[in-house]
């Protein structure tokens, strides 16, 4: 079958990386696992050998022959023919996620996952995306993505995966990442406003916090002149001269709360 470029299909073929992903998920026969992207079923089969139940969400119905082969062999596999971004995941009751994700939905599907109550997710991403997810302050990888994902999950970069592990070979390297869900380490008063602040400041990651906020005031829905007045009012409560890329997540959360109290 010819893979769909539109759907970002690169099927994982190398069993060593399949095993590595499964090992890091620490699966047991009590686990209910979600997989997004069936491929030719290499990962699905290995999941089904261990887990109590495997839900696979797949959009491309051309893969039905692979699905039929798997479901005839494993009674604990259920295929959901749909767009993963549109499925109500809360109805599935999974506690772990293991998937070779279609790269073009990496960001939206990750944030959709993080809204769910799971324990562990072991996921394949494009290498550069994975590095940014795990990014730390004062590094080139530190980004809006780093702060947003690490708000309620620990991110562990497992390993780099070469193009040769897939069919067809993608043009980029990939990586396996482990997300462990947890309660936030710091409090934000309004998560949607926090996301707006992240978007605003990381558009100018090399500038000072103050300059970045003013230049992207439209992102947080505050007129520039009003924002300047707010910043003057709270200037003794925050180090606004710090560069965005050096500011740790908890300080950004504190900043978000300061601004939220003033609007």
Swiss-Prot record:
Q: Name one GO molecular function term.
A: RNA binding
Q: Which InterPro entries match?
A: KsgA/Erm, rRNA_Ade_diMease-like_C, rRNA_Ade_Mease_Trfase_CS, rRNA_Ade_methylase_Trfase_N, rRNA_adenine_dimethylase, SAM-dependent_MTases_sf
Broad class of the protein's primary localization: cytoplasm
Q: Where in the cell is it found?
A: Cytoplasm
Going by the UniProt record, its keywords in alphabetical order are:
Cytoplasm, Methyltransferase, RNA-binding, rRNA processing, S-adenosyl-L-methionine, Transferase
Q: Name one Pfam family in it.
A: RrnaAD
Q: What is the role of the protein in this entry?
A: Specifically dimethylates two adjacent adenosines in the loop of a conserved hairpin near the 3'-end of 16S rRNA in the 30S particle. May play a critical role in biogenesis of 30S subunits.
Q: What is this protein called?
A: Probable ribosomal RNA small subunit methyltransferase A
> What is the scientific name of the source organism?
Methanococcus maripaludis (strain C7 / ATCC BAA-1331)
């Amino acid at each position: 079958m010819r893979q769909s470029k539109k759907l970002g299909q690169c099927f994982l073929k190398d069993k060593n990386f399949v095993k590595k992903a499964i090992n890091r998920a620490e699966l047991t026969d009590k686990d209910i696992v979600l997989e997004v992207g069936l491929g030719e079923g290499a990962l699905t089969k290995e999941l089904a050998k261990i887990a109590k139940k495997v839900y696979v969400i797949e959009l491309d119905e051309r893969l039905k022959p692979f699905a039929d082969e798997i479901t005839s062999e494993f009674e604990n596999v259920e295929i959901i023919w749909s767009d993963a971004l549109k499925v109500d995941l809360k109805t599935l009751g999974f506690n772990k996620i293991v998937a070779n994700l279609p790269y073009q939905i990496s960001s939206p599907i990750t944030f959709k996952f993080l809204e769910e109550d799971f324990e562990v997710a072991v996921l394949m991403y494009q290498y550069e995306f994975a590095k940014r997810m795990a990014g730390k302050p004062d590094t080139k990888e530190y980004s809006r993505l780093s702060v947003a994902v690490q708000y309620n999950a620990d991110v562990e970069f497992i390993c780099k995966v070469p193009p040769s592990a897939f069919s067809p070979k993608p043009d980029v390297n990939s990586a396996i990442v482990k997300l462990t869900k947890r309660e936030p380490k710091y409090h934000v008063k309004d998560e949607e406003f926090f996301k707006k602040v992240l978007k605003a400041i990381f558009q100018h990651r090399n500038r000072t916090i103050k300059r970045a906020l003013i230049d992207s005031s439209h992102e947080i829905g505050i007129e520039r002149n009003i924002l300047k007045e707010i910043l003057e009012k709270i200037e003794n409560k925050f180090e606004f001269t710090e560069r965005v890329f050096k500011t740790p997540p908890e300080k950004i959360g504190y900043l978000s709360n300061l601004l939220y109290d003033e609007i």
